[in-house]
A protein has these predicted regions:
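Short, cationic low-complexity segments
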Residues: 278-300
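Active-site-proximal alpha-helix that buttresses catalytic centers in soluble enzyme cores
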Residues: 2-6, 27-124, 128, 132, ...
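Short catalytic/ligand-binding loop motif for oxyanion handling, primarily in non-cytosolic enzymes
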Residues: 60-63, 107-111, 135-138, 168-170, ...
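Active-site-adjacent alpha-helix immediately C-terminal to a catalytic or transition-state-stabilizing loop
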Residues: 41-44, 60, 109, 117, ...
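N-terminal chloroplast transit peptides
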Residues: 2-21
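Phosphate-handling substructures
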Residues: 117-205, 252, 270, 274, ...
Length: 300
């Protein structure tokens, strides 16, 4: 595949990639940005190029073995290093995202900031949406994973965590952990805010954002970065790769490792790969798989 050179940085020879031309009307005036799907389609590149998915690094609650979900916690020291390493890997691959999409949660925001800083691209515009948030774990949020497994049984907790369409117990609207009480969601209709979610719910809330926000940016930019979470990225991979419900349940996305897709003009993946050392990628993926069984430390 011929990758759009605008997605890449300078070549080894030092020559800069060609600049993206301004769109101008016949009179020479700069053309307005497209506002409709038809306008976007009309100016779409023959090859939209590259989509990079990045799962945030380890958080402090991952380190403490607590269910996190929509709870807003920062990266741990290890998570900070994972984010910096992700930026280094993207820089070494000469990726130059034109825009970043991320969730409203701090651990994803920090991952984006650290990665872009390492790439010397902190100026890249960032768009945020609750639709890219981690899966909401309901009443499990803030609970110790091992203690929860001891209380309810490992099989029950594994079903809550890794099934496609089974939700954990929900939060009451009066519970301070409910997103109704979080100011960052104050402008959203209350009926959109979950009290708990299964992976199927995450797929259903993520897809409108894919079509309405990410797809137009893929047509306008040679490279787009999505910085999010294990379950919101699994939802996106399910759509991109055409995975069935069981396949996506078994999918394990490692933390802090860029997953790079090369797309055709119809936004179908031509190929994908993880950046970085294959052994390290396999180790992190295996760690995520072990976490699903209730072992310590999970990036959820």
């Amino acid at each position: 595949m011929a990758i759009d050179s605008r997605a890449l940085g300078p070549s080894p020879s030092g020559a800069a990639p060609p600049a993206q031309p301004l769109r101008r009307s016949p009179s020479g005036a700069t053309r307005h940005l497209p506002t409709s799907g038809e306008e976007v389609k009309a100016i779409a590149k023959p090859n939209p190029g590259i989509l990079v998915l990045l799962r945030h690094g380890e958080s402090t609650w991952n380190l403490e073995n607590l269910f996190t979900g929509w709870t807003d916690v920062p990266l741990s020291d290890r998570g900070v290093q994972e984010a910096v390493d992700a930026g280094r890997l993207m820089k070494e691959a000469r990726l130059r995202p034109g825009v970043v999409h991320e969730s409203l949660l701090l651990r994803a925001i920090q991952t984006t900031q650290l990665a872009l800083a390492k790439m010397e691209m902190s100026w890249v515009p960032v768009k945020r949406s609750w639709r890219l948030n981690e899966r909401h774990y309901g009443a499990l949020q803030g609970l110790n994973k091992k203690q929860t497994a001891d209380q309810y049984g490992e099989d029950k907790v594994k079903l809550w965590r890794r099934s496609y369409d089974v939700r954990p117990p929900g939060l009451e609207p009066s519970d301070e952990r409910h997103p109704l009480h979080d100011p960052r969601y104050s402008t959203l209709p209350p009926e959109l805010l979950p009290s708990t979610e299964c992976l199927k719910d995450v797929v259903e809330r993520m897809l409108p954002y894919w079509y309405d926000a990410i797809v137009p940016d893929l047509h306008l930019n040679a490279c787009v970065l999505v910085s999010a979470h294990g379950n919101s990225l699994r939802a996106l991979v399910k759509h991109l790769d055409g995975l069935d419900d069981q396949e996506v349940v078994e999918l394990n996305i490692p933390t802090g490792v860029p997953r790079m897709y090369e797309l055709d003009g119809d936004l179908r993946p031509r190929s994908w790969r993880y950046l970085g050392d294959p052994d390290e990628v396999a180790r992190r993926a295996a760690a995520v798989k072990a976490q699903a069984s209730g072992s310590k430390s999970s990036s959820t």
